[in-house]
């Protein structure tokens, strides 16, 4: 990644705690770190002088990403999970085989309170993890003084010092009722789950009394215990005190784009996250449901035991997509905070996307020249980019945006309602739009572009070139922008025969193309949404006898997505709770629609 782009990303770092992941040229995570203030810590790598070890790391960094947390403690706990997950080579010397400590109440006849680094399914009660052994021991010391559980690993023949200090009930000598242990365990659980505040208040009173009595050493001990409680009892939303596998979803929307963040919690720990950004076409909640349906179709996305969702999501529809998973819409507590944190990270990522685009807008003149050189054409000072937008062929539209010297010229943007094409025929749509646009350019003597960019591949490019050359007699370079499976700009296609133009993905030229494609896509989507709001969205279920709004909603809820409904048999449609004759009509209608779309695509 270019130094300039790194600087742009550094300028957008938040004043919040979190973890950062440094990547090399291959996109491999080479170092994971934590920070109380992400902005200050990450920037420090790219300024000032460093020792030789740090300098070697910095020389290999070409990109970075970060995860915002709610506290420094969470950043600390998340860091260890990320290091275990990615095993970055620059972290290896700092890593050992130990994990973070937990406080455990053992499942024994005479239970003990111990510190352990291994969490087992042994019916013991575990609390943590804690940032370090010192902090865990400080809390245990407080608990030992408050709750006299046994301290010895094996019972001695006589009472020990702990009994005389009032910190053990001496089960080695006396018969201690199970109910007494149960009472102490309940109080310890309450303490470690928030009741520590009452204990802290009692300690503060004792500290004040000791100070008033000139017992400063004793007051200092109380002070240290209070500080230990405050630093270690902070809520830890990034880790759950169980072994349940969960996926936590949050999403944010802006300018026709959606960002979805998924936190993968495995064995109770946040170990990874997925970030997806894409334009959305329908209502945000509907497209989010579609995303979830597609998400769990991927081989490496196995549905977990639980899924946490935001408030405005149709949980019943999600349940239909992953029937064996428990769907939860948290209303309070740590689970709710996790969903909020996923949303917070999605919003930050989306804002960063647009801010980076705006900052790059000021630095594109050189990129325009280098783009022309890479393509073997004169500098494309005027670029006109096209994109088509429709849903199942309804209300098809196209849009054109113009970039002058690498900057958008919004006065030259154009919108087109498709007039001559029926159904989802992208090639015919492209032919119509190119014909209308450049016939008008010729007629009115408007400026000709130096380059035409098409959102698509060979079929769309050939359609545009055929109209320009054979119908209008124009010789304008036409290139295509292909996308990957995450709807991100992937490659530039140009030439005869078509070839991939070799551009570095982290070059300014590539960012310029990405911005052009994003902008024309946004413009087309916005126009399409405005048009649909006036005419009403015509679903492929509209017009089917016996399928009104209620049954339409029932079908979509049952199948989770239009894609699954399209693949359903008559019997499967009937299982959604509709009569057989209606199921047959739906199947007949969808089959005809699919066949029409298939024939159009083959043409």
Curated annotation (Swiss-Prot):
> By its UniProt entry, which SUPFAM superfamilies does this protein fall under?
C-terminal UvrC-binding domain of UvrB, GIY-YIG endonuclease, RuvA domain 2-like
**Lineage: superkingdom:** Bacteria
Q: Which Gene Ontology molecular-function terms are recorded?
A: DNA binding; excinuclease ABC activity
**Gene Ontology cellular component?**
cytoplasm; excinuclease repair complex
Q: GIY-YIG domain: from which residue to which, for each copy?
A: 15-92
Report the residue ranges that make up the UVR domain in this protein. Answer: 197-232
What's the stated role of this polypeptide?
Answer: The UvrABC repair system catalyzes the recognition and processing of DNA lesions. UvrC both incises the 5' and 3' sides of the lesion. The N-terminal half is responsible for the 3' incision and the C-terminal half is responsible for the 5' incision.
PANTHER family in the cross-refs: UVRABC SYSTEM PROTEIN C, UVRC/OXIDOREDUCTASE
Subunit annotation: Interacts with UvrB in an incision complex.
- Family affiliation: Belongs to the UvrC family.
Q: What is this protein's record name?
A: UvrABC system protein C
